[in-house]
Amino acid sequence: MENSVLGQLFDLVAAFDKVGLRPIICGGLGIHLSLHGRRKELSSRTTNDIDLMLTNQQVLDSATRKTIAEIITGDLDYGVCKDGRYFMFEKGQQKLDILTQPVDGVEIDGFRAKLVKSRLHAYVTPEAVFIEEDLRKISLSELFPDNDGAKGLTVDVPSPTNLLILKLFAFNDRDSGSRQDGDKAHAHAFDIYIIVASANLGDYREGAEFLVRHGNSDIIQKARSIVKDKFSSADSAGWLRVLETSSFFPNLNIQQRRQKLIEAKARLVRWFS
């Protein structure tokens, strides 16, 4: 992962910590943090943006909403992206996207939760409904061992199962239809491979319990449907997207790469069965 986005993360976590908040980080960076310290055959995808997920508790408290808006646009000096006003921010090459769990009690306009008028909105993410379950707490001192300022700073990342759910929905959104985007579909599929290939038995068992708890949820049923439709064989759309990715084991021949996909497919199907 590039040092620039890790530095961006440090500043965000430090600013949140000053007001007693701990951010939840999703997306490619969240995956990188979730798997930090694990032995991986492939490195997680590089990214220059941070996906910040706000919780119901943060969104429903007016003072907290205003505090987060001040941190982003004031303390950290992010500017608003023209193509994502008030929920996509930038500072130089750094990007910050604001997401939220589905929430009642604030103004919603389409996919947009209007948290602080003309200052902070958030992209409503229905598949994040269970995002606070089984969170992983990551110490920044593990990422910045030589930085004394990192001591005591922590960040939350979703569980591998919740990361998979987010990525399955994101892939499905970008693989076909009106929002089709080949580059983003490739990125989401690659992220799914990284999560599945790097997960351990504890992750799988935790996920199995999670899926039992929420098996009747429309979100879980949809996630299982995406796995069935787009990841249930090595020739399914999702795995073909991975195979097309230039960073997917470039030194292996096609048969060896397909074998990697077959193994990952079996893991993912078993995970959501």
Features from the language model and the residues they span:
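Compositionally biased terminal segments of proteins
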Residues: 1-273
